[in-house]
Every structure is written in C-alpha cells, then in structure tokens.
Amino acid sequence: MPNPASLLDQPHDVRLARKALWFACKPGDRSIHTEDVKVPGRGGPIAARVYRRPDLQPGAPAILFIHGGGFVDGGVDFCDGAQRGLAARTGAVVVGLSYRLAPEYPFPAGLEDCQDVLRWMAESRPAGLDPSRIAVGGESAGGNLTVALALSSRDGGGPRIVHLSIYYPFTDTTLKSTDWDTSDMPGVGRAEGEFMVRVYARKDTDNPLVSVLHADLRGLPPSTVITCGHDPLRSDGIWLAEALVAAGVSTLHTHYADMPHGFLMFSRLTRRADESLDEMARETARAFAGTISIKSS
C-alpha cells in the first residue's frame, strides 16, 4: 500500500490506493452482455464499454455513466458493477467510458471525452438505442462531469439528455464547505480537495463547467441527487440540489446520512448501495417513460 503522505504528490499512488477499495464492490450481473469499443474523440480514441440485457430490443433508451476518482483515477472498470446493475434494472443500453485524467490531462480533456461519447451514442446508436431517450449519471468527479456535460449540451446544441443522476458530486472549487475539515471519511480532506482543484481545474477554477454549483442551471433535465453524511462533499451535493430546485429543475434529493463518500461502489459492505442504484434506475426509467414528476429536496 502506498505511503499516504505521498498521495498528494504522486497521482500514480492515488490510483494504486483506490484500487485497494475495489474489494468492496460485488461482481456485477454476469447475464449482461458487454462490448468494449473505441470511440473517436478529439484527444484520440476513447475506451468505452456498452452493456445490454440479452433480451434487449432495438429502440431501447440509454444511459451514459461517468466514473469518479477525483479526476485523477478510475476508468470503465471502476463502476462495472453499477453499470451492469443499471442495465439489468432499466433494460437500457448503458455505456461507461475511460475519460482522460489529470494531471496529465486537465480540464477540459475529460469533459471533451464525455461530450464525444455522448455524441457518438446519439449518432452511431450502439445496440440500436433510441437517441431521443439518453440519460446521464455519474459519481463524485463523475457527478461533476454529469452536470458539466448537461450544461455544455444545453448551451452547445449537443444531444438531448432526459435525466441526470448525480451521486455525491464535487461542485465548488472554492472549497468553502467546512465538511472538508470535519468529515470523518478516511483519506479525504481539505488537502486532497485542494490537490484535486490544482491538478484538474488549474487556471479554470471559475469556469462554470468546473465549479458547476455557480453555473446557470436553468433548463437542465430532471435530476436525482444523492448525498451522504460521512463525506467531505456532503454540502457540495446538498447545495447543488438546492440550486437545481431554485433554478426550476425537477429535482429529487435523497440523503443517506449513514453512508460514506463512494458508497455506490461498496455493494459488498452495505445494502444501501443497491438501494441507491434501485432509486437511480427507478427515476431514470420514469424519465424515459415521460412520467417523472417534480420533487424537491
């Protein structure tokens, strides 16, 4: 195991330390068919994985899921169990990707990869998906990228997104939340938050596609926001849910007060992971059916 003192200086060690947590995630549903693909991207081919149930019919809706990892770690394998679970629960085509990571590739590289995969989904229609029914979800840094992707798609004429699932997102580069100092989540505190901002945002800390809490959120798709109590990003997610409601966005906010940051990946350790995935699948399916109603935090 890497020396924790080195984690802020060596992103490679961060990645090794994160892999030690993979034991907490159950293997996903092996009945789900998968296909690894390379998606053309502005920064080169993007590794992606397409998930589908064996009984999938053409015209199914789709979900793009964006992994977390503090913008410096993770890949398509990181959320494999959750992505399989979404495909099984919703009957949608689910796509995960390995976007470019900081510090080698700071903003906007990772967001551009997400944009390119979303556009590929809408234009190439893998597994015969319905391009008019695409949802996006993500956790932690991927939650940030989920909101940024919706903003850029709204403002740049990108593919229509029908629903957002936003798990314990990073939203505020000012790090003004005292949760960064008081959270009891091991190994994640203010120093780690400052490191993340430094290597990912660099000089773009005020860009609303990075500090998404400060963006104009009006007109975003219906959203489900999941927050947790033992988390330095607790307030980041709560404030985002409140800002979405204030912007008139149909928003469901569920707070898991007893859960730590990253709990979606801890399916071996807690039933809450599957419960939250059930909720995400349910709300996304309602959006696909056009029956989602306005709920607020």
Which residues are covered by each model-predicted region?
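Alpha/beta-hydrolase active-site loop
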Residues: 105-125, 280
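A glycine/proline-hinged amphipathic helix-loop "lid/cap" segment
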Residues: 1-53, 288-297
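Short beta-strand/loop motif that positions the catalytic acidic residue
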Residues: 225-227
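Proline/glycine-enriched tight loop/beta-turn segments at coil->beta junctions
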Residues: 44-46, 53-62, 218-220
